[in-house]
From Swiss-Prot:
Top-level taxon of origin: Bacteria
List of residues binding pyridoxal 5'-phosphate: G106, Y107, S176, H204, T233
Quaternary structure note: Homodimer.
Modified residues (N6-(pyridoxal phosphate)lysine): K236
Protein name listed in UniProt: 8-amino-7-oxononanoate synthase
Organism name: Pseudomonas syringae pv. syringae (strain B728a)
Function, as annotated: Catalyzes the decarboxylative condensation of pimeloyl-[acyl-carrier protein] and L-alanine to produce 8-amino-7-oxononanoate (AON), [acyl-carrier protein], and carbon dioxide.
EC number(s) per entry: 2.3.1.47
Catalytic activity field: 6-carboxyhexanoyl-[ACP] + L-alanine + H(+) = (8S)-8-amino-7-oxononanoate + holo-[ACP] + CO2
CDD domains: KBL_like
GO molecular function, one term: pyridoxal phosphate binding
Amino acid sequence: MSFDLRTRLDARRAAHLYRQRPLLQSPQGPQVIVDGQPLLAFCNNDYMGLANHPEVIAAWQAGAERWGVGGGASHLVIGHSAPHHELEEALAELTGRPRALLFSNGYMANLGAVTALVGQGDTVLEDRLNHASLLDAGLLSGARFSRYLHNDVSSLEARLEKSVGDTLVVTDGVFSMDGDIADLPALARSAKAKGAWLMVDDAHGFGPLGANGAGIVEHFGLSMDDVPVLVGTLGKSFGTSGAFVAGSEELIETLIQFARPYIYTTSQPPALACATLKSLQLLRTEHWRREHLTRLIQQFRRGAEQIGLQLMDSFTPIQPIMIGDAGRALHLSQLLRERGLLVTAIRPPTVPAGSARLRVTLSAAHSEADVQLLLNTLEQCYPLLDASHSSEPVHA
């Protein structure tokens, strides 16, 4: 019996859910070349505008000269280089925690943390809109797995009453497709009241949130006692690649011993850690980046309201324009692209059925003129949305 892959692919295409990879032919930034076309992009996660920063590039080059271009082995063999260790110490300082542990990417950090902490006989409770990596981690952990209603503390508490064994409450800090933030103070209170631990994946909060860019935990003034497990990624606001988990001495040592995605993989290039150390320095010292980004977010929301666009309740750089139908979302994305703007249409299964959207993301590298151009073009294109649309998707 053969695998009928063609039928699956045809069904996805017919539902306007077929995904294709745009080919980036320039460095990351607001001005890009995609599939040969110059475009103004509003769809990357380089929130602080550091992915193509000359000082970060120079740090990578110097790191490669000093340390070479490969990690060479896993961290537990001979792949844990001095730059890796220095970056872990810097990330621990940023988060105000005793230790931090580097992972190769955010998916591996989430999978490693959850599966190392809970298993059969334990409980994982997750927000239903968590990132796919967190949901996969919960399912793969072998623990009793349940999802509570989005940002709904009462729904969480009802599930906490039925939890068994060690219980891990897991949430995004900033929800990647909606842009809203978790009610961490309430989640922390509920978890602590039942003796559960709270784990936060703050992939999209580091950089934009907090007085020093230390994310949602800093934003709310919470402690390690409130949020014992804190995850961050380095491929967004830090402008490089990788991820980390920050927490207590015991937590990090537990992950080193039991987190299989950490143990059984080659370390990242040491030069990458050198680059990230530089971007971390810029993130902590160049506060104008957060201030400028905040102004751009406010500008976009004011303008979108005047146009009559339906936005989500978000004060973060993630500003989704709700469309509903996947075909209509693709059509609006195509209309913008024809006018030189790149904004990705997000469709199921990434978001729930009937909630397709254009996911606008803003960066400190954008200018006020860039945002105004986006608003002007949206005002032109939105009335055209109900015209016949192409069945060929152009983005994810």
